Swiss-Prot record:
GO terms for biological process: protein repair; response to nitrosative stress; response to oxidative stress. Keywords: Cytoplasm, Iron, Metal-binding, Stress response. This is Iron-sulfur cluster repair protein YtfE. Belongs to the RIC family. YtfE subfamily. It comes from Salmonella typhi. It is found in: Cytoplasm. Gene3D superfamilies: nmb1532 protein domain like (1.20.120.520). The gene is ytfE.
Amino acid sequence: MAYRDQPLGELALSIPRASALFRQYDMDYCCGGKQTLARAAARHDVDIDIIEAQLAQLAEQPIEKDWRAVPLADIIDHIVVRYHDRHREQLPELILQATKVERVHADKPNVPRGLTKYLTALHEELSSHMMKEEQILFPMIKQGMGRQATGPISVMESEHDEAGELVDVIKHVTQNVTPPPEACTTWKAMYNGINEMIDALMEHISLENNVLFPRALAGE
């Protein structure tokens, strides 16, 4: 099957572990989920035939859960527990680790300068964003008022883009979240944590942008 003309967001939802494959190639399937596989491959200089073959292999596996068929209230409950609560735990710990690494290794050329500042900005951005979702948007959707939520959803999507831009900056200052040879245990653990946080955030944004919001606006 040809996947090149399909949007990344759709492929991430319909093919098991496609999201992990896209992360491997640094393809944005959440905020950039509307771009086709062909366009994303061209932007990242990836051989389209190779990634299509990899997706075909993944597509042979059974999909764990098709969120496109799950009730919206259940999706919202899953988002809050699986992602909102997790981000609230992850980011303060990562900020503490970044503060330590930047202080202890200040003289090292590969130290991720500014990482604490950018993680703090992301934490503040997401804290405000998630509170607005939980207090305003999610109750509207649960009450069947998704069609009237065009304004709040537009704001949330814009804030998703802003969070994605901060993630790009974090990836830049950490050399794509790759620890250098001299990295200590804390440094390596922090980068593992950052990768986990980015994975969770991309899954979170993808589920909202590509499933929850379109279905809510359609009046489900």
